Amino acid sequence: MDFPVHSFWDFSLSVHSRTGVPEACLAVQRGYGLDINLLFFYCWAAVQEGRPLGRERVTQAANTVTGWQEEVVRPIWKARWRLKGGFGSFPPEQTEALRKTLIAAELDAEHMEQLRLAEALPVSARREADDSTRLAAAVANLADYLHTSIPDAEAPPGGAPPEDLIQALSTLVAGVFPGLESGRIRDDVAQALKKRS
């Protein structure tokens, strides 16, 4: 398929190529059912605007693509993962060929989802924001998304959010801000999730 060029897609490909990010995405996708395209969108919007989207726009973004994610992207993803390593007595060369076709279909479906997000919620670039400000905005956007998507993943009063979630989101955010210290990013993510309880 041919798609129009868009900075959001280019941003996502760049971040996804960084060390640890593919594994972090898989961890939150499998462990928490999160939409990776939304995670990338919330980070991209923070980088572009230099401020949080706010809970209303975070929710609007999720509502824009929930049906597509649940009925198109996730079923393709599940089928692709189910075929990894073969499927029962089906010929492995055939199941592998089908799996490769599903990889391409999944990538196209994700690309379509990202273009839809960018169209439905336009963001405007604010160049004056520094990386610290953009980091705070990205972490706030992600925390708002988690609050509406998986409230039980938040920290109980006086407790800590799930460590695997903190680690995966910190790795993703570090891929967005490779110039910032990873320990600081992890602390910011943990604190933002804790505040939402």
Question: What label would you give each PLM region?
Answer:
Residues 55-121:
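Aromatic-anchored, charged helix-turn/loop surface patch used as a conserved interaction hotspot
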Residues 8-30, 84, 97-99:
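Short amphipathic alpha-helical segments and their helix-coil junctions
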Residues 29, 103-132, 146, 151:
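Long, amphipathic alpha-helical coupling/dimerization segments that relay conformational signals between
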Residues 134-197:
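Glycine-rich, aromatic-bearing surface loops/beta-hairpins
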Residues 3, 26-37, 92-93, 160, ...:
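Structural motif
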Residues 5-8, 34-38, 95-99, 110-114, ...:
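Short runs of predominantly hydrophobic/aromatic residues within well-ordered alpha helices
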Residues 21-68:
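N-terminal interaction modules that seed assembly of large macromolecular complexes
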Residues 11, 24, 40, 44, ...:
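A general alpha-helix detector
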